[in-house]
Amino acid sequence: MNIHRSTPITIARYGRSRNKTQDFEELSSIRSAEPSQSFSPNLGSPSPPETPNLSHCVSCIGKYLLLEPLEGDHVFRAVHLHSGEELVCKVFDISCYQESLAPCFCLSAHSNINQITEIILGETKAYVFFERSYGDMHSFVRTCKKLREEEAARLFYQIASAVAHCHDGGLVLRDLKLRKFIFKDEERTRVKLESLEDAYILRGDDDSLSDKHGCPAYVSPEILNTSGSYSGKAADVWSLGVMLYTMLVGRYPFHDIEPSSLFSKIRRGQFNIPETLSPKAKCLIRSILRREPSERLTSQEILDHPWFSTDFSVSNSGYGAKEVSDQLVPDVNMEENLDPFFN
């Protein structure tokens, strides 16, 4: 597997070449460490437990401490031993980490996409370190009920910028949703795409896909309607529209507790936009949530929309200020994958 990246990253390997660093261009030649070497002198096993539990031992991985699990049994809170910097560590099987991270390796860096800071290779596991985050967009919108247009415009521009960069770099994200975007700062003014692990690497200019990958609330009509292929980029754009609507309105544009009823509403592509939104915001939503994929804006065209250049300080500041009274963003109801509905 050939992996290329325009900028290098630190990769440490344990064994004879302990602390050796390699660029992404050399990833294809990396193998597991020598079995005689041990990671941790005194702090327990370097490998996280198979299932998270309260008895998880603190583990020492190179210059990092792995603390409690954050998600499942493969994502952990980590701390740099010397600086005290907090990070996130994702643990992969050594045999498949290159495939899992391939989209990261083939895409150039972007300020709104989570970057790998270091990879440490063990005998059976690869430990991949990312900068920490300060919560996700789904939880933020749910807490706020909905966002004022000025705040939504600032955050959504960053979201669309990350997606446009992926599309320009030959990636289709497939499973876009608010939860995939996390905050870079405690003030919650800067966001980034949490991971690219679900992304599909395009071979050339053709972005046709045929899988049913995605989240029910965010899935596009053509994915539900067709048994053949569809435009992956256009499907991503539809998901962006669902995200924008949810940020501004406080509920999904299409919602129902029954999946079959939800999918029927999505297929029809009919939704209501509150009159409290500004004309430019309504225009952008309607330009994205088009039932016909070819009629939607591209991710790059979204960035050029005049809504983002609105001077909100002199425009009608009342837009988006009315409280939401029903259909708040659910905590988990429609956050499951599509797969069970098509098996």
Curated annotation (Swiss-Prot):
<dbReference type="GO" id="GO:0032693">
    <property type="term" value="P:negative regulation of interleukin-10 production"/>
</dbReference>
<comment type="similarity">
    <text>Belongs to the protein kinase superfamily. CAMK Ser/Thr protein kinase family. Tribbles subfamily.</text>
</comment>
<feature type="compositionally biased region" description="Polar residues">
    <location>
        <begin position="29"/>
        <end position="45"/>
    </location>
</feature>
<dbReference type="GO" id="GO:0032436">
    <property type="term" value="P:positive regulation of proteasomal ubiquitin-dependent protein catabolic process"/>
</dbReference>
<dbReference type="GO" id="GO:0031625">
    <property type="term" value="F:ubiquitin protein ligase binding"/>
</dbReference>
<dbReference type="GO" id="GO:0004860">
    <property type="term" value="F:protein kinase inhibitor activity"/>
</dbReference>
<dbReference type="GO" id="GO:0005856">
    <property type="term" value="C:cytoskeleton"/>
</dbReference>
<dbReference type="InterPro" id="IPR024104">
    <property type="entry name" value="Tribbles/Ser_Thr_kinase_40"/>
</dbReference>
<dbReference type="GO" id="GO:0005634">
    <property type="term" value="C:nucleus"/>
</dbReference>
<keyword id="KW-0649">Protein kinase inhibitor</keyword>
<dbReference type="GO" id="GO:0043405">
    <property type="term" value="P:regulation of MAP kinase activity"/>
</dbReference>
<dbReference type="GO" id="GO:0045599">
    <property type="term" value="P:negative regulation of fat cell differentiation"/>
</dbReference>
<dbReference type="GO" id="GO:0061629">
    <property type="term" value="F:RNA polymerase II-specific DNA-binding transcription factor binding"/>
</dbReference>
<feature type="region of interest" description="Disordered">
    <location>
        <begin position="25"/>
        <end position="50"/>
    </location>
</feature>
<dbReference type="GO" id="GO:0055106">
    <property type="term" value="F:ubiquitin-protein transferase regulator activity"/>
</dbReference>
<dbReference type="InterPro" id="IPR000719">
    <property type="entry name" value="Prot_kinase_dom"/>
</dbReference>
<keyword id="KW-0963">Cytoplasm</keyword>
<keyword id="KW-0206">Cytoskeleton</keyword>
<dbReference type="GO" id="GO:0005737">
    <property type="term" value="C:cytoplasm"/>
</dbReference>
<dbReference type="Pfam" id="PF00069">
    <property type="entry name" value="Pkinase"/>
</dbReference>
<protein>
    <recommendedName>
        <fullName>Tribbles homolog 2</fullName>
    </recommendedName>
</protein>
<dbReference type="GO" id="GO:0031434">
    <property type="term" value="F:mitogen-activated protein kinase kinase binding"/>
</dbReference>
<dbReference type="InterPro" id="IPR011009">
    <property type="entry name" value="Kinase-like_dom_sf"/>
</dbReference>
<feature type="domain" description="Protein kinase">
    <location>
        <begin position="61"/>
        <end position="308"/>
    </location>
</feature>
<comment type="function">
    <text>Interacts with MAPK kinases and regulates activation of MAP kinases. Does not display kinase activity.</text>
</comment>
